[in-house]
A protein has these predicted regions:
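Short loop/beta submotifs within extracellular cysteine-rich repeat domains
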Residues: 77-79, 88-89, 150-151
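Core segments of cupin and vicinal oxygen chelate
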Residues: 25-28, 34-78, 134
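Short amphipathic alpha-helices in soluble, non-transmembrane regions
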Residues: 48-50, 108-112
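Vicinal oxygen chelate
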Residues: 2-4, 18-26, 29-39, 59, 69-72, 86-110, 128-133, ...
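Conserved beta-strand in the GNAT
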Residues: 80-82, 141
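Bacterial N-terminal signal peptides
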Residues: 3-15
Length: 160
C-alpha cells in the first residue's frame, strides 16, 4: 500500500513538473489595451472623469498635440489612448502583454511560427518592447519593464 502511495505521489509530482515546464510563466499579464480616437480630449476626459482612471503618463507631438496617454485602471493595467491618423482608424489598435523575459518569449513565439519583430527600447517609455501579429492580424506588444520604465514607475507608485 505504501509503495502504491509513493508511486501515485511521484506521478503527481512528475505531472505537475511537466505542466510547469510546458506552460511558461514569463507572460505575466495583460498590461494594456490601445485605442485610437478621433476626439482625443473628449476621450481623455471620459477616462479620467467618468471612468476614474488617473493619467499615468502622456506624450505630446512637437506642435503640442497629443501623441499618446496612458490611463491607469489598476496597478498593472492601463488604457493607452492615441489620436487617429491615416494609418490608424478609430477603435482598437493593439494590446500589450507584460513579460518577465522578453528574449525568451520572442524566441519561443518565433519557434512556434509567429512573426515577432526584434526587441528594442522605447525612447519614450524606456520599456523593452517587441511587436508581433497574431494569425488573425491583431497587433500584440510584448513588454518588459525595467526599473527605469514609465510603466514600472506608475505600477510602483500605484496606491490601492
Amino acid at each position: 500500500m505504501r509503495q502504491l502511495l509513493y508511486l501515485a505521489a511521484g506521478m503527481l509530482i512528475g505531472a505537475a513538473a511537466h505542466a510547469a515546464a510546458v506552460q511558461p510563466r514569463d507572460i505575466v499579464s495583460l498590461n494594456h489595451v490601445a485605442l485610437a480616437t478621433a476626439n482625443f480630449d473628449e476621450a481623455a476626459k471620459f477616462y479620467t472623469d467618468v471612468m476614474g482612471f488617473p493619467q499615468a503618463f502622456a506624450f505630446r507631438e512637437p506642435d503640442g498635440s497629443p501623441r499618446l496617454s496612458y490611463f491607469q485602471v489598476s496597478r498593472n493595467t492601463f488604457v493607452e489612448l492615441m489620436p487617429v491618423s491615416q494609418e490608424r482608424p478609430a477603435g482598437f489598435v493593439h494590446f500589450g502583454l507584460e513579460v518577465t523575459n522578453l528574449d525568451a518569449v520572442v524566441q519561443r513565439l518565433r519557434a512556434r511560427g509567429m512573426d515577432v519583430k526584434d526587441p528594442s527600447v522605447s525612447p519614450r517609455t524606456k520599456s523593452r518592447v517587441a511587436v508581433a501579429r497574431t494569425p488573425q492580424g491583431v497587433v500584440v506588444e510584448l513588454l518588459e519593464f525595467g526599473p527605469g520604465s514609465l510603466h514600472r514607475k506608475a505600477m510602483t507608485d500605484w496606491k490601492d
